[in-house]
From Swiss-Prot:
Span of zinc fingers (CysA-type): 1398-1417
Main location: mitochondrion
Domain free text: The CysB motif binds 1 4Fe-4S cluster and is required for the formation of polymerase complexes.
Pfam families in the record: DNA_pol_B (PF00136), DNA_pol_B_exo1 (PF03104), POL3_N (PF24055), REV3_N (PF24065), zf-C4pol (PF14260)
Residue positions binding [4Fe-4S] cluster: C1446, C1449, C1468, C1473
Family membership: Belongs to the DNA polymerase type-B family.
Source organism: Saccharomyces cerevisiae (strain ATCC 204508 / S288c)
Subunit structure: Forms DNA polymerase zeta with REV7.
GO molecular function, one term: DNA-directed DNA polymerase activity
Cofactor binding: number and manner: Binds 1 [4Fe-4S] cluster.
EC number from the UniProt entry: 2.7.7.7
Protein name (Swiss-Prot/TrEMBL): DNA polymerase zeta catalytic subunit
Catalytic activity: DNA(n) + a 2'-deoxyribonucleoside 5'-triphosphate = DNA(n+1) + diphosphate
C-alpha cells in the first residue's frame, strides 16, 4: 500500500460509511452560563411544580463540523445534581416519597437562601412559606443505586438533588455535610464531580470527539455575515449539510428570543433528547443481587466497558484491515501455578476472619445462600436508577415560532454525503488482562533436588554474609560464589547418600533396562573436559569467569598506603611488568644447549607486499576521524559520535508535509509573535513601547477551509506621511509573505481581531504569552488604549468568561483565558514534556528541532528596525520574528503536543484544556465514573475533614538499600509490567469490593477509608470461600462474586494498549503518520493506568481517597517483590543474588556469568516468577548491565544491553549527575567520560590522567564559560526573605532592579556562574549571569569552588566504591604559574605585565627588558619574530573561522553574504550557543595582555 493511502486511512475509513443521519459537532471547548429560562429550558421541577426557576444553566460547546466550519452549540436542559441517602423506608408509598421530596426541596431552598443572605433587607428574605421563584434547587426525587465506597449488595435509595447553579454545588454540599441544613450530618454523593464532567459522562461524550444530534435549532442568520465569512467559507459540503438539517420554517429560532451571541459561522441550540451518543451506552444492572455468582449475566454486555475503548478497538481493527494485517489475536497467556495467595500474615488473618464470621452470623442454624440472601422487594422496580431518572427534567419539545426575517425557506430530505465516520478513542474487547510478555517456552526443573534450608542453615548463611562484609578483597564475585556453594553443599548433604546409591545401581543397568552380565565390558567414562572443569569450579564456589578488576597501568599511580573506604579494603594493583613478582631460580642449574647450525629441512614463503597508496587511503577513510585538537581548551565531550550531540532524536517524518484529512478532526492553531522598539537595553514595556510589528502563523495542516489566503503574514505600523518607500522595501525584503500596513497601533490591533474572527482558531499560542506575544498586546490595549481586546478575541459577544490573572494557570500553563479558545504557553508546555537546562526558544530549537537560531538583543533589533535605509537589517528583523513564529508551530508538532492531548481527551472524556490544566485525579475520575454510571454505582464525595480523619497510609513500597559497589559481572534488570494496575486486576482490589478490616469487622460502624458502613448479617458466612484477604488485613470480594470496577477499567486500558503496540510493531517504519497517531493513543492509555493508584492514595487533596485500599495495593506489591526475590535466590542453578529492588523492579547479580548466559537466565527468572503470580501480573526481563555501579537508592549507572545481538552498549544512568539538571554541563561531561573509561578499560591511570588534565584546564581558565553555567528554577515570591533566596534569585533580583520587565516566569531556569570574590564573601554574592561575566573582563571563574565543590564530591561518590579518593588526585596537580589569559583580575593584569618571564618562550628573565624577551630570544630575532607572527595568525584564523560560522548561521535572516552580514552576525548574543562563547574568547585573545606584549615586541623587532 502506498504512503498516501496509509496517511489517509482515517479519512478513507470515515468516507466508507453510509450517509450520516446525524448533525455532528466536534467538542473542542465547553463552558456554561446562566440565563433566564426560555421555552427550550425546563421551567419547573416535579417536587415543587408550582415554583418556577429564576435562572437555569446552559452549556456552550465550541466545536467544528466535519466540513471544518466552526459552530457554537447551546445545550439546554442539563442540570447539575448530587445525592444523599433517603431517610424513609422502601415500604413508603409513591405519594409519601413525593411528600418527602417536596419537604426536602423546600428545606434546602430556604436554608440555602438564608446562608446566602447578608443583609436584613435582602430581597431573598422569605416571608412565611412563600418561596416564589426557585434560585438554587431545581428538583428533588428518589432514585435507587448501589454505594460505590465499600462492598454493598442490594438496592439503596437516595435523594437526587438537582441544582440550578453549578457554582453553588460545592457550598451546598458542605452545608448538608456539616448538618446546617437538616440538623444532622449526611454523606454526600457525586458532588465532587464537576458539572461539565457530569454531562459528558451522562451523555457518553468525549473531548475533541463528536456529538451526534438528530436535529437542532439554528439561530438567525444561519450563516454569520460579519466580515463576509458566510461568503468566504460556504462550500458544497456545508450547503449539503444545511439543506438536510436546516428547515427555515421549523427549526430557525427568532432573533428576538434567541439573538446570536457567538462570532462564529453557525450557531445552534439543542435539547438533551437530541443527543444520540447516549444510545451507545451499555447499561448493566448486576449489583443489586449476586448475579455474577449465580451466572445470570449471559445477556448483559461485557467488556470493553467504556465506549471510547470500544471505539478504539473498532478503529484499530479497521486500520489493520486497511493495512492488510492479520486479524489481531491476544498474546498467549503464561501458564500460572498459583493455588492460593499466602502472605506473611495469612494464618493470622484467617483466624481473625473466622472470629468476624462468627460475630456477624445468626445462630438459627440456617445456612445462608446466594439465591435468597437479598430481599427482592418489588417496590424497587417502580423506582428509577440514576440512568433512568436522567430525562425527568428534560424540557419538552417546543412548537417553534416561524422566523419571517430569515432567508427563503428551504427543504431537502436527502441524506448528506458524509465524508467521515465517528472518530473517538477506544477501549478493549479482549480477555487479555494486562501486558503480556515474551513467548519463552516453559522450562521444567523437576530434575533438581528439592531442599529447604533449616534455621541452622540460615545462621550459617548469616555468618558467611558477616564475614563477606569484613573481607578485604576488592571483588565480590568470589566471596558471593563461595557463599552460594556453601549453601548448596548444606542443602544437598541430606540427599547425598541416596543419590550415590541410586547412581551405583544405575551403572549395572543397560539403557534398555536389562542388567549387565558378569562378563560384560562397559566403556569407561570419557576424561573430563573444559565444561566439566568450569562446572566443578562453580560447585566449589569459584566464578566461571573472573572479570578484570580496576587497575593502574602506570605503576607510579599506585599509592603506598592501602586503598580503603567505609571499613573495606580494596586490593588494587598495576598491570605493568615492573610490579610483577619475579620468578626465583635460586639453587637450580640451568643448562643451555647450542642450537644446531643447520636444519634438515628449510622452507620459504613470500612476504606480504607493502600496502599501496590507494589501499592506505581507503583504510584511512574507513577509520573514524578523532577530530582536531582545537577542543583542548574545552571540557572533553563524553563521546565523539554525533548522535550524542542532540538531546532528542531527529524526526524524519516531521520534515514531510502532512497531508490534510478530508474530515476535519483536529484543532485549528494560530501562533503569534510581536516586535516592539525599546529604549536602550531595556526589555519592551507595554506601558511605554508600542508594538511596531505583529507576525502571525497559522498551522496549515489544521486549517480545513480554502479561503485563498496565506498561512502566515505580517502587520506593520507605518504612517503614510513618513517614508513613502518603506512599504516597498519591506515587500522586497519578505518576498511572497503578505504584509499589511496600518496608520496606528490601534488600527493594527483591530485588524488582528478581524483576522482571529475570520480564521476562528481553536488554539492561540506564543512561545511566552505572558510578557510577550498575546500577553503584551492585551496589556498594551488595557494600559494605553483602554480597550479590552480579550472580549474581541473571544468567540462570544456576551456572557464572556475570561481570566487575565489566573494564578494557578500563570504558574503551570497559561494565565490568560479567552472564552472559546485554548491558550498554549509553548515554553511551559515544553517544560512538562522535555528535560532541558534552559527553556529559551534557541535551546528548544537546537535540542528538539536540531536548528541553531541566532539571538539578538532588543536593543540590536530596535536599532536594525530603525535603520530603515538598510534593506539587509530590515530583512534580518522580519525574518528573525517570522522564523520564530514558524518555530513555535514546529516545536509543538515535533512533540505532538496538540495531537497527544487530543488523543487523551478522546480517550478519557475530558476537554482539551483539562488535559494539560487539570491533575491526574480528574482524568481517572472521568474514566471511572463512566463505568460506575453504567452499573448504577453512586460515588461518595468526602469532605476535606473526612479526608484528613481517615487512617494514615501505613505501607511503603519495597525499596532495598543496594549493596553499593562496582559490579564487573552481568547484572540483570527485571521489571514488573504495570505492577499496581496488575495487582488491582489480579486480586480484585477496588472500592466496590472492600468488605472491611479483618481485625475490626462488625455489623455496624465499619471504618474503611473516609467512610463508615454496616454489613448485613451472615454476609461473611455467605462469602467465606469468595473473599481475598490482602496482606494489610483488608477483606475483598473475589471476582466470582463481583468483578471490581477498577479491574474493568484497567483491563480495558491495558488490553487496548497491548493491541496498539502490537499494531505499531507490525506496520513498520514506513507509515510514520499512523505510527505517531497510535503512539499518542498508547501514551494516553499508559498515563491513565499509571495514575490510577494515585487516585486511591491521595491523602491530602484526594477527591475520593481510601488509605486502606492504597495500603492493600502497596503491601501486595511489596510482598510480590519479596516472593520473587525468594524464588530467584533459592534456585541453585542460577547462582544469583538480588542486590537491589525498587517498587516494581529487581536487580539480580550473576557473578562469573557471561552476558549470553545472563540473557538466558534472565528470561527463565521472569518466566518462573510470572508463573507464581496471578494473572495478569507479569515480570519482564528488561536488560543486562555489564558492567555497572550501584551507588544508593534510585542511583545507578551501567552499560546496558537489551538483546544478545547488541554489540555496542547504551550508557544508562539514573539519579546521578549525568542525568540531573541541578549541576553544570562540565560536571555531566566529565563524570560520564570517567564512567565510560572505567567500564571500557578499567584503567584507573587513564581516568586519573584525564581528570587531572581537566582540572588543570579549569585552573588556568582554558574552558568555555557555557560549561560552567548553573541553570536552576527560580520561584520569586516563594522565599521567606532575601537572605534565604538561592543564587539564581539573587541574580534575577539584581537584573530586576535595573529593568522591572526582566522578572522571570514562575519556575523559569536562570543561568549563572560562580566567580572569585573577596575573602569571606557569600557564595550567592559571587554569582553572576553569563551577560555580567562576559561584560566584566576582570571576572574569573572560581576554579577551586568548581573543582572541590561541584566535581570532586560526585566523582568521590562513584570511585570511593572501589577505594579511590579523587580529591587526592586533584591535590597532585601542579598549579599553573600563569593566570588565565582570558579572565584575569585587574590586579593580576598589572602583575602579569611586570612578570619576569619571557613573553615568547616563558623562561625567567635574568634582567629587566622593555621588550619582555630573554637574551636567547633577543639573539634569535628572526626566529622570535616568526614565532610571534605564527601565534598572531593562528589566533586571527581561529577568530575568522568562528566569525564565518556566525555569518553562515545569520545568513538565513540576512540573505546577504557581504560585509553587512558580518556586522549583523557580530551582534548575535545567543547564550545557548557554544560558538558565541568561543567567539568572545577568541576576540579577547587578540587584545589580552600577552597579545599586547607580543605586538609591542614584534613592532620593536621589525627592523631586522
Amino acid at each position: 500500500m502506498s504512503r498516501e493511502s496509509n496517511d489517509t486511512i482515517q479519512s478513507d475509513t470515515v468516507r466508507s460509511s453510509s450517509k450520516s443521519d446525524y448533525f455532528r459537532i466536534q467538542l473542542n471547548n465547553q463552558d456554561y452560563y446562566m440565563s433566564k429560562p426560555t421555552f427550550l429550558d425546563p421551567s419547573h421541577g416535579e417536587s415543587l411544580p408550582l415554583n418556577q426557576f429564576s435562572q437555569v444553566p446552559n452549556i456552550r460547546v465550541f466545536g467544528a463540523l466535519p466540513t471544518g466550519h466552526q459552530v457554537l452549540c447551546h445545550v439546554h436542559g442539563i442540570l447539575p445534581y448530587m445525592f444523599i441517602k433517603y431517610d424513609g423506608q422502601i415500604t413508603d408509598t409513591s405519594t409519601l416519597r413525593h411528600q418527602r421530596c417536596a419537604q426536602v426541596h423546600k428545606t434546602l431552598e430556604v436554608k440555602i437562601r438564608a446562608s446566602f443572605k447578608r443583609k436584613k433587607d435582602d430581597k431573598h428574605d422569605l416571608a412565611g412559606d412563600k418561596l416564589g421563584n426557585l434560585n438554587f434547587v431545581a428538583d428533588v426525587s428518589v432514585v435507587k443505586g448501589i454505594p460505590f465506597y465499600g462492598y454493598h449488595v442490594g438496592w439503596n435509595l437516595f435523594y437526587k438533588i438537582s441544582l440550578l447553579n453549578p457554582s453553588c454545588l460545592s457550598r451546598i454540599s458542605e452545608l448538608i455535610r456539616d448538618g446546617k441544613i437538616f440538623g444532622k450530618k449526611f454523606e454526600i454523593y457525586e458532588s465532587h464531580i464537576p458539572y461539565l464532567l457530569q454531562w459528558t459522562a451522562d451523555f457518553n461524550l468525549f473531548g475533541c470527539s463528536w456529538i451526534n444530534v438528530d436535529r437542532c435549532y439554528f439561530r438567525s442568520p444561519v450563516l454569520n455575515s460579519i466580515l463576509d465569512i458566510d461568503k468566504l467559507t460556504i462550500n458544497d459540503d456545508l450547503q449539503l449539510l444545511l439543506d438536510r438539517f436546516c428547515d427555515f420554517k421549523c427549526n430557525v429560532l427568532s432573533r428576538r428570543d434567541f439573538p446570536r451571541v457567538g462570532n462564529g459561522l453557525i450557531e445552534i441550540d439543542i435539547l438533551p433528547q437530541f443527543i444520540k451518543n447516549r444510545e451507545k451506552l451499555q447499561h448493566r444492572d448486576i449489583h443489586h443481587d449476586f448475579l455474577e455468582k449465580l451466572g445470570d449475566i449471559s445477556d448483559i454486555p461485557v467488556k470493553p466497558y467504556v465506549s471510547s475503548a470500544r471505539d478504539m478497538i473498532n478503529e484499530l481493527t479497521m486500520q489493520r484491515e486497511e493495512l492488510s494485517l492479520k486479524e489481531y489475536k491476544e498474546p498467549p497467556e503464561t501458564k500460572r501455578h498459583v493455588s492460593g495467595h499466602q502472605w506473611q500474615s495469612s494464618g493470622e488473618f484467617e483466624a481473625f476472619y473466622k472470629k468476624a464470621q462468627h460475630k456477624t452470623s445468626t445462630f438459627d442454624g440456617q445456612i445462608p445462600n446466594f439465591e435468597n440472601f437479598i430481599d427482592k422487594n418489588q417496590k424497587f422496580s417502580a423506582i428509577n436508577t440514576p440512568y433512568e431518572a436522567l430525562p425527568q427534567l428534560w424540557p419538552r419539545l417546543p412548537q417553534i415560532e416561524i422566523n419571517n426575517n430569515s432567508m427563503q425557506d428551504k427543504k431537502n430530505d436527502d441524506q448528506v454525503n458524509a465524508s467521515f465516520t465517528e472518530y473517538e478513542i477506544c477501549g478493549v474487547d479482549n480477555e487479555n488482562e494486562g501486558v503480556k510478555g515474551s513467548n519463552i517456552k516453559s522450562r521444567s526443573y523437576s530434575w533438581l533436588p528439592e531442599s529447604i534450608a533449616s534455621p541452622k542453615d540460615s545462621t550459617i548463611l548469616l555468618d558467611h554474609q558477616t564475614k563477606y562484609h569484613n573481607t578485604i578483597n576488592f571483588s565480590m564475585d568470589c566471596a558471593m560464589t563461595q557463599n552460594m556453594a556453601s549453601k548448596r553443599k548444606l542443602r544437598s548433604s541430606v540427599s547425598a547418600n541416596k543419590t550415590s546409591l541410586l547412581s551405583r545401581k544405575r551403572k549395572k543397568v543397560m539403557a534398555a533396562g536389562l542388567r549387565y552380565g558378569k562378563r560384560a565390558f562397559v566403556y569407561g567414562e570419557p576424561p573430563f573436559g573444559y565444561q566439566d572443569i568450569l562446572n566443578k569450579l562453580e560447585d566449589e564456589g569459584f566464578p566461571k569467569i573472573d572479570y578484570k578488576d580496576p587497575f593502574f597501568s602506570n605503576p607510579v599511580d599506585l599509592e603506598n598506603k592501602p586503598y580503603a573506604y567505609a571499613g573495606k579494603r580494596f586490593e588494587i594493583s598495576s598491570t605493568h611488568v615492573s610490579t610483577r613478582i619475579p620468578v626465583q631460580f635460586g639453587g637450580e642449574t640451568v643448562s643451555v644447549y647450542n642450537k644446531p647450525t643447520f636444519d634438515m629441512f628449510s622452507s620459504w614463503k613470500y612476504a606480504l607486499k607493502p600496502p599501496t597508496y590507494d589501499a592506505v587511503q581507503k583504510w584511512y577513510n574507513k577509520v573514524p576521524s578523532m577530530g582536531n585538537k582545537k577542543t583542548e581548551s574545552q571540557i572533553s565531550m563524553h563521546t565523539p559520535h554525533s548522535k550524542f550531540l542532540y538531546k532528542f532524536a531527529s524526526d524524519v517524518s516531521g520534515k514531510q508535509k502532512r497531508k490534510k484529512s478530508s474530515v476535519h478532526d483536529s484543532l485549528t492553531h494560530l501562533t503569534l509573535e510581536i516586535h516592539a522598539n525599546t529604549r536602550s537595553d531595556k526589555i519592551p514595556d507595554p506601558a511605554i513601547d508600542e508594538v511596531s510589528m505583529i507576525i502571525w502563523c497559522l498551522e496549515e495542516e489544521t486549517f480545513p477551509l480554502d479561503l485563498d489566503i496565506a498561512y502566515e503574514g505580517i502587520m506593520i505600523v507605518h504612517k503614510a506621511s513618513e517614508d513613502s518607500t518603506f512599504p516597498t522595501k519591506i515587500q522586497h525584503c519578505i518576498n511572497e509573505i503578505p504584509v499589511m500596513f496600518y496608520e496606528s497601533e490601534f488600527e493594527m490591533f483591530e485588524a488582528l481581531t478581524d483576522l482571529v474572527l475570520l480564521l476562528d482558531p481553536d488554539i492561540l499560542s506564543g512561545f511566552e504569552i505572558h510578557n510577550f506575544s498575546w500577553g503584551y498586546i492585551i496589556e498594551r490595549c488595557q494600559k494605553i488604549h483602554q480597550f479590552d481586546i480579550v472580549r474581541e478575541l473571544a468567540r462570544v459577544k456576551c456572557q464572556i468568561k475570561t481570566k487575565l490573572s489566573d494564578t494557578w494557570g500563570y504558574a503551570h500553563s497559561s494565565g490568560i483565558m479567552i472564552t472559546g479558545r485554548h491558550m498554549i504557553n509553548i515554553w511551559r508546555a515544553l517544560r512538562s514534556d522535555v528535560n532541558l537546562t534552559q527553556y529559551t526558544i534557541e535551546s528548544a530549537a537546537f535540542n528538539i528541532l536540531h536548528k541553531r537560531l541566532p539571538h539578538f538583543s532588543f536593543e540590536s533589533l530596535t536599532n536594525m528596525w530603525n535603520a530603515k535605509k538598510s534593506t539587509t537589517e530590515l530583512k534580518t528583523v522580519l525574518n528573525y520574528w517570522l522564523s520564530r513564529a514558524q518555530i513555535n508551530i514546529q516545536l509543538l508538532r515535533k512533540q505532538d503536543y496538540i495531537a497527544r492531548n487530543i488523543e487523551q481527551a478522546r480517550l478519557i472524556g475530558i476537554d482539551f484544556h483539562s488535559v494539560y490544566y487539570r491533575g491526574s485525579q480528574f482524568k481517572v475520575e472521568s474514566f471511572l465514573i463512566r463505568i460506575c454510571k453504567s452499573e448504577s454505582f453512586i460515588l461518595l464525595s468526602p469532605g476535606k475533614k473526612d479526608v484528613r480523619k481517615q487512617k494514615a497510609l501505613e505501607c511503603v513500597p519495597l525499596v532495598m538499600e543496594p549493596e553499593s559497589a562496582f559490579y564487573k559481572s552481568p547484572l540483570i534488570v527485571l521489571d514488573f509490567q504495570s505492577l499496581y494496575p496488575s495487582i488491582m486486576i489480579g486480586y480484585n482490589y477496588c472500592y466496590s469490593t472492600m468488605i472491611g478490616r479483618v481485625r475490626e469487622i462488625n455489623l455496624t460502624e465499619n471504618n474503611l477509608g473516609v467512610s463508615k458502613f454496616s454489613l448485613p448479617r451472615n454476609i461473611l458466612a455467605l462469602l467465606k470461600n469468595d473473599v481475598t484477604i490482602a496482606p494489610n488485613g483488608v477483606v475483598y470480594a473475589k471476582t466470582s462474586v463481583r468483578k471490581s470496577t477498577l479491574s474493568k477499567m484497567l483491563t480495558d486500558i491495558l488490553d487496548v494498549r497491548v493491541m496498539i503496540k502490537k499494531t505499531m510493531n507490525e506496520i513498520g517504519d514506513d507509515n510514520t503518520t499512523l505510527k505517531r497517531l497510535l503512539n499518542n493513543k498508547q501514551l494516553a492509555l499508559k498515563l491513565l493506568a499509571n495514575v490510577t493508584y494515585g487516585y486511591t492514595s491521595a491523602s491530602f487533596s484526594g477527591r475520593m481517597p481510601c488509605s486502606d485500599l492504597a495500603d492493600s495495593i502497596v503491601q501486595t506489591g511489596r510482598e510480590t517483590l519479596e516472593k520473587a526475590i525468594d524464588i530467584i535466590e533459592k534456585d541453585e542453578t542460577w547462582n544469583a543474588k538480588v542486590v537491589y529492588g525498587d517498587t516494581d523492579s529487581l536487580f539480580v547479580y550473576l557473578p562469573g556469568k557471561t552476558a549470553i548466559e545472563a540473557f538466558s537466565i534472565g528470561h527463565a527468572m521472569a518466566e518462573r516468577v510470572t508463573q507464581n503470580n496471578p494473572k495478569p501480573i507479569f515480570l519482564k526481563f528488561e536488560k543486562v548491565y555489564h558492567p555497572s555501579i550501584l551507588i544508593s537508592k534510585k542511583r545507578y549507572v551501567g552499560f546496558s544491553y537489551e538483546s544478545p545481538s547488541q554489540t555496542l552498549p547504551i550508557f544508562d544512568a539514573k539519579g546521578i549527575e549525568t542525568v540531573r539538571r541541578d549541576g553544570i554541563p562540565a560536571q555531566q561531561k566529565i563524570i560520564e567520560k570517567c564512567i565510560r573509561l572505567l567500564f571500557q578499560t578499567k584503567d584507573l591511570s587513564k581516568i586519573k590522567k584525564y581528570l587531572q588534565n581537566e582540572f588543570f584546564k579549569i585552573q588556568i581558565g582554558k574552558v568555555s564559560a557555557q560549561d560552567f553555567c548553573f541553570a536552576k528554577e527560580v520561584k520569586l515570591g516563594a522565599y521567606k526573605s532575601e537572605k534565604t533566596a538561592p543564587a539564581g534569585a539573587v541574580v534575577v533580583k539584581r537584573r530586576i532592579n535595573e529593568d522591572h520587565r526582566a522578572e522571570p516566569q514562575y519556575k523559569e531556569r536562570i543561568p549563572y556562574l560562580v566567580v572569585k570574590g573577596k575573602q569571606g564573601q557569600l557564595l550567592r554574592e559571587r554569582c553572576v549571569s553569563p551577560e555580567e561575566f562576559l561584560e566584566g573582563e576582570n571576572l574569573e571563574l572560581d576554579s577551586e569552588y568548581y573543582i572541590n565543590k561541584i566535581l570532586i564530591p560526585p566523582l568521590d561518590r562513584l570511585f570511593n566504591l572501589i577505594g579511590i579518593n579523587v580529591g587526592n588526585w586533584a591535590q597532585e596537580i601542579v598549579k599553573s604559574k600563569r593566570a588565565s589569559t582570558t579572565t584575569t583580575k585587574v590586579e593580576n593584569i598589572t602583575r602579569v605585565g611586570t612578570s619576569a618571564t619571557c613573553c615568547n618562550c616563558g623562561e625567567e628573565l635574568t634582567k629587566i627588558c622593555s621588550l619582555q624577551l630573554c637574551d636567547d630570544c633577543l639573539e634569535k630575532r628572526s626566529t622570535t619574530t616568526l614565532s610571534f607572527l605564527i601565534k598572531k595568525l593562528k589566533r586571527q584564523k581561529e577568530y575568522q573561522t568562528l566569525k564565518t560560522v556566525c555569518r553562515t548561521c545569520s545568513y538565513r535572516y540576512t540573505s546577504d553574504a557581504g560585509i553587512e552580514n558580518d556586522h549583523i552576525a557580530s551582534k548575535c548574543n545567543s547564550y545557548d550557543c557554544p560558538v558565541f562563547y568561543s567567539r568572545v574568547k577568541a576576540e579577547r585573545y587578540l587584545r589580552d595582555n600577552q597579545s599586547v606584549q607580543r605586538e609591542e615586541a614584534l613592532i620593536s623587532l621589525n627592523d631586522w
